[in-house]
């Protein structure tokens, strides 16, 4: 594969370290920047990743995919990390439109009974063309505001998933084009909307502390209500506004959003064809309760309609390391309960932390594996 590197650090020499899918170093190249841009060629193998370093400077480690055209190395002043953005050769990234949806029935617990959603359409969008639908449970952080404009005030210091960049590249090379709906989940109801309806004692001890606020003053988890909002309000609204293919949708999420995508997808297999589940908070549930929950999903009974599962897990940082220990058995358990291993793609990166920088490259990598003919 060939891609361009833009060096925004104003450093003439950098080492580019290439890792195998298992994390072993397979190449180490010294790059010399006579100007800020150079072209690099690598032998692409599925799951390879790279990072750049010189002395005390070391960037994040990012997994590569054939969709990547340009990587930009920069220093992020907000989180004080050396980060890597990716760009397209054409400066066109589509458009985001914001809608506010009301639902008195399912969003009864919210003071205003409303949710903001952000709908991204590609740069070549046409009302005459039919599109597949992707729903993301972390809507406030999935699009890069420098490319699609300001659409939310709830930004994260780690930036965005840059989904607009990935899907633009994906749509160029695939028959099926996507539009993307992001659901804003950055307010006080994030945990209660994205976490299964359970008792506080069903969670592991650390999670009980984290989720205690969800149960104050008679409150509870609202995942079932939130799921019904998607099915009964969001989906009909999107179908009325956009020309969608009459096919199943894709759901995407990380952390609590990863847990939501996992359970929403497996509880609604008749609606969902693909699940992207990153750094999932499924590990916050006690093992016995989790096993009981998996059994209720009736995986064996629904073998013919099981969604494709794309599971990512990092291993760096306090939170990500804890989730990694809990999620270590997720794939083996799914297989034990009858999940077709050919429908599960799994990537573990020990150097990846619990943030958008990690998830944007995991998403880019996984979506490059999609086969339109499946």
Predicted regions and their residues:
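Non-cytosolic beta-sheet module surface loops
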Residues: 5-9, 42-44, 110
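Beta-strand-rich interaction surfaces with strong enrichment in secreted/lumenal proteins
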Residues: 28-29, 60-62, 105-107
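Extracellular beta-sheet/turn segments enriched in Thr/Pro/Gly and aliphatic residues
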Residues: 60-90
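Non-catalytic cap/lid and distal C-terminal segments of serine-dependent acyl enzymes
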Residues: 50, 86-374
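Short, acidic Ser/Thr/Gly-rich low-complexity loop/linker segments typical of extracellular
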Residues: 22-38
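Short Pro-Gly-centered beta-turn/loop motif in secreted/extracellular proteins
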Residues: 35-50, 62-67
């Amino acid at each position: 594969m060939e891609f361009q590197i833009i060096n925004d650090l104003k450093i003439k020499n950098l080492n580019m370290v290439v890792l195998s899918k298992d994390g072993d170093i397979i190449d180490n190249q010294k790059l010399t920047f006579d100007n800020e841009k150079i072209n690099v060629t690598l032998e692409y193998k599925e799951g390879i990743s790279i990072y750049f370093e010189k002395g005390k400077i070391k960037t994040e480690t990012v997994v590569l995919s054939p969709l990547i055209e340009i990587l930009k190395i920069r220093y992020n002043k907000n989180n004080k990390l050396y980060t890597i953005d990716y760009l397209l050769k054409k400066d066109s990234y589509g458009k985001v439109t914001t809608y506010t949806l009301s639902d008195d029935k399912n969003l009864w617990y919210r003071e205003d009974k409303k949710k903001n959603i952000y709908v991204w359409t590609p740069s070549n969008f046409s009302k005459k063309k039919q599109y597949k639908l992707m729903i993301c449970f972390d809507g406030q952080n999935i699009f890069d505001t420098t490319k699609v404009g300001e659409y939310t005030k709830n930004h994260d210091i780690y930036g965005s998933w840059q989904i607009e960049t990935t899907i633009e590249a994906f749509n160029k090379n695939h028959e099926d084009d996507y539009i993307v709906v992001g659901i804003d989940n950055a307010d006080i109801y994030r945990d209660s909307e994205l976490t299964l309806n359970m008792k506080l004692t069903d969670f592991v001890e650390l999670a009980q502390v984290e989720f205690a606020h969800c149960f104050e003053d008679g409150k509870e988890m609202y995942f079932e209500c939130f799921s019904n909002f998607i099915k009964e309000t969001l989906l009909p609204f999107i179908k009325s506004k956009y020309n969608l293919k009459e096919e199943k949708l894709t759901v995407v999420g990380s952390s609590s959003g990863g847990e939501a995508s996992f359970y929403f997808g497996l509880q609604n297999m008749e609606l969902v064809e693909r699940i992207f589940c990153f750094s999932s908070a499924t590990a916050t549930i006690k093992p016995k309760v989790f096993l009981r929950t998996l059994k209720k999903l009736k995986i064996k009974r629904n073998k013919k309609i099981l969604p494709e599962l794309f599971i990512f897990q990092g291993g760096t940082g306090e939170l990500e390391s804890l989730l990694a220990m809990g999620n270590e058995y997720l794939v083996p358990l799914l297989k034990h309960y009858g999940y077709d291993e050919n429908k599960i793609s799994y990537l573990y990166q020990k150097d990846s932390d619990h943030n958008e920088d990690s998830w944007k490259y995991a998403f880019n990598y996984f979506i490059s594996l999609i086969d339109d003919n499946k």
